[in-house]
Amino acid sequence: MISRYLRWQVLGSFMGKLLFAERDGVQVLKLIGDVRVTLGPTISTFLTRLGESKTFKSIIIDLTETQGIDSTSLGLLAKISLTTQETFGTIPTIISPNEDITRILESMGFDKVFVILKELVTECGQLGELNTEIVSESKLRKQVLDAHRVLMSLNERNRGEFQDLVQALEHERVGEPAEQRDRVA
């Protein structure tokens, strides 16, 4: 299904980068390196495009080269799963050979919203590079807030873990001018 002919696009940052490939409705999102909040806008744009896809059949999130991943990025991945299930009626797959990362995924409840496998069956093709998206601080704050709300919705452990952060971010948003809050999608 996924072959060496897949077209890759790189969505990157200084610490980590995202690679994307699509073929015959199968979309692959590969996270490389240390994936942090700075990649949030890029993941959000991917999520928007995914929801608008007319050819979507399935998605694979490849963590084979992921060294670290923060909670904002995890929340956005969870949002990809929930959106995919809601919009297309399919459960995404995560490839995670790193036991430490797999343990984090399972503790966050990802085993309830993803199929988690240890290896990708075939290699994907040539890589091409794209720029990382830069967004305003208020938009980034909203993405962090939304990502953590999604994580909180997965299980009670997450709710307890991220409740203080979400409340702090909500409090910061209250202090923003209304036109700035309303502008943030």
How should each PLM-predicted stretch be described?
Residues I2-E65, L82-A185:
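STAS-like cytosolic regulatory interaction modules
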Residues L77-S81:
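Histidine-anchored nucleotide/phosphate-binding helix
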Residues G68:
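Residues immediately C-terminal
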